[in-house]
Regions:
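Active-site beta-loop-alpha junctions enriched in small/polar residues
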Residues: 19, 67-69, 102, 129, ...
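N-terminal active-site wall of soluble small-molecule enzyme domains
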Residues: 61, 66, 73-174, 180-185, ...
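Glycine-rich phosphate-binding active-site loops on the catalytic face of alpha/beta enzymes
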Residues: 138-158, 196-204, 242-263
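C-terminal helical cap(s) of enzyme catalytic domains, especially alpha/beta-barrels
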Residues: 213-217, 240, 255-288
Length: 289
């Protein structure tokens, strides 16, 4: 994977999006959109429940992520069982679960999403590079309650159309931004849940100042979610005090021996006001982001 990322150069996102469009075309030839539309008609995603889960006052709202691999770190977990990980997240206080389904760069699949859906009651987010309506239908039929929409991967027309279509299917949408220009585009498109990714999808660099710099620009009525690079209870407390309603945490949990226990430690530290930077590190040798 390191060699693959090296060949991509400075714009990994463009490479992933191109690969995604090709892969989706292949899947659609095997299973037409009309067939998925028929299946989706009998499914009722919990999009409203997803949004509600992120906005409970007086609670630290964590979306725990299931992810086998990342382009920046390679394999995160050889013994990857997303259903068991998700169940552990739920047992230790996660309000939702994010599941990577992108196959080429993250080794994810819709089967992972289905397994998680069967294992938990809390809302499930399909995290992928959504660029076509077909992927929304896939998400619905696989059991997702919400999807990730990455502003940097879409033009304004695509973003608006996918957001509207997701809503019409009953899906929630976590609309991801990295800078002020992308935030303005998300707001213009009508995004309600806005995730600020501290990791640049073009360079993979992580900077928590992305979340700190943008929180003041989130309009009233939107739900801010801080993503990537969150490792300690202190991170959650400081960003929560700044105005974020929820936090999406992936690699920092996936690289611990017991991801659910690690999530519980973060929650306990944030609830008690223990901002010790070692709260999560006590359960991890490899580190994470």
């Amino acid at each position: 994977m390191t060699d693959q990322v090296g060949r991509v150069g400075s714009d990994l996102l463009a490479t992933i999006v191109a690969a995604t469009r090709h892969a989706v075309g292949e899947r659609e030839r095997g299973c037409p959109a009309s067939e998925l539309t028929s299946r989706a008609a009998s499914v009722s995603p919990g999009g409203a429940r997803f949004v509600a889960a992120l906005t409970v006052r007086g609670r630290v709202n964590i979306i725990g992520e299931c992810k086998r691999r990342s382009p920046s770190r390679g394999i995160l977990r050889a013994d990857y069982r997303p259903d068991r990980i998700a169940a552990a997240y739920e047992a230790h206080g996660a309000v939702a679960v994010s599941v990577l389904t992108e196959p080429t760069f993250f080794d994810g699949s819709l089967d992972d999403l289905r397994a998680v859906r069967a294992a938990v009651e809390i809302p499930v987010l399909r995290k992928d590079f959504i660029v076509t309506p077909y992927q929304l239908l896939e998400a619905v039929t696989a059991g997702a309650d919400a999807v990730l929409l990455i502003v940097a991967a879409l033009d304004d027309a695509e973003l608006g159309a996918l957001l509207d279509q997701a809503t019409s299917f009953g899906l929630g949408a976590l609309v991801e931004v990295h800078d002020a220009a992308e935030l303005r585009r998300a707001v213009k498109a009508g995004a309600v849940v806005i995730g600020v990714n501290n990791r640049s999808l073009r360079t993979l660099a992580v900077d928590l100042d992305a979340s700190r710099n943008l929180v003041g620009q989130l309009p009233p009525g939107t739900v801010g979610v801080a993503e990537s690079g969150l490792r300690t209870s202190e991170d959650l407390m400081s960003l929560g005090a700044a105005g974020y309603k929820a936090f999406l945490i992936g690699e920092a949990l996936m690289t611990t021996p017991e991801p659910g226990v690690a999530l519980g430690r973060l929650l306990d530290g944030a609830r008690s006001g223990d901002g010790d930077a070692r709260v999560l590190a006590r359960g991890v040798e490899a580190g994470g982001s």
